[in-house]
Design a protein with these regions (language model features):
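Short, low-complexity disordered leader/linker segments with a strong preference
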Residues: 1-32
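A residue-level marker of the well-folded mature domains of exported/periplasmic proteins
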Residues: 20-220
Length: 220
């Protein structure tokens, strides 16, 4: 998720400039303190969380030396931890609290209203109430998925597969993953307008084994 990394880098740079009154200086000198809150998949999810964490590390460029003082990540084991983790972060000495993914939407809305002086960012959401202390970022995920659909359908045509059937495996149904699926479907149908496309949702963001099983069953 290179866009997530780029967004986090951009926001940190802008925030740092404002925090210092646009004074000249390096990221290390600015002393902006940021915390990344993730779901149970953590910062090694190879997706939004990992990209956001890479963006933070790239911004500070200190090979992890500032972890715990300038930046940190906190992992929620369940969704019940979202609000408490956000409150704890807001009451700690962090300039910026970052969350990734639509599952944080309700919790961020609730806590941002309680801490109007704390700055929050949520990535992959743009439909929450607009407030001065909450920045929302969204992607056009369907564009990349459209190209994946075109590639899959084109390969099927090159392989001479008659009446090919296509599959889509998702994590948890919701606004974001639906955009991925719709883009994929439209890409497939640009090549095969009447193609049959089946989908399956694992209902978990951290269960690749089940996703693999579902994908394999589509082949079978």
């Amino acid at each position: 998720m290179k866009k997530t990394l780029a967004i986090v880098l951009m926001v940190l740079c802008v925030f740092s400039a404002f925090a210092q009154g646009a004074a000249e200086g390096t990221a290390k000198d600015d002393q902006v303190k940021v915390v990344l809150l993730t779901d149970a998949t953590g910062i090694d999810d190879k997706s939004f969380n990992a990209a956001a964490w890479r963006g933070i590390l790239a911004f500070y460029g200190d090979e992890g030396a500032g972890r715990g003082t300038l930046y940190e990540n906190i992992t929620a084991q369940t969704s019940d931890d979202y609000v408490p983790n956000l409150k704890n972060a807001a009451e700690a000495d962090w300039d910026l609290v970052i969350t990734t993914g639509f599952t944080w939407g309700d919790a961020v809305t609730e806590v941002a209203a309680l801490y109007p002086d704390q700055k929050f960012i949520i990535v992959d959401v743009d439909y929450l109430p607009k407030t001065d202390n909450l920045i929302q970022y969204i992607y056009e995920e369907e564009q990349g998925s459209y190209l994946v659909g075109v590639a899959a359908a084109t390969q099927a045509k090159l392989d001479g597969i008659a009446n090919p059937k296509f599959g889509f495996v998702g994590g948890v149904a919701g606004a974001t993953i639906t955009k991925f699926e719709i883009g994929y479907i439209e890409g497939v149908k640009s090549v095969y307008p009447d193609a049959e496309i089946v989908d399956y949702y694992v209902n978990n963001w951290g269960d690749p084994a089940s996703a693999k099983t579902a994908a394999k069953s589509m082949y079978d």
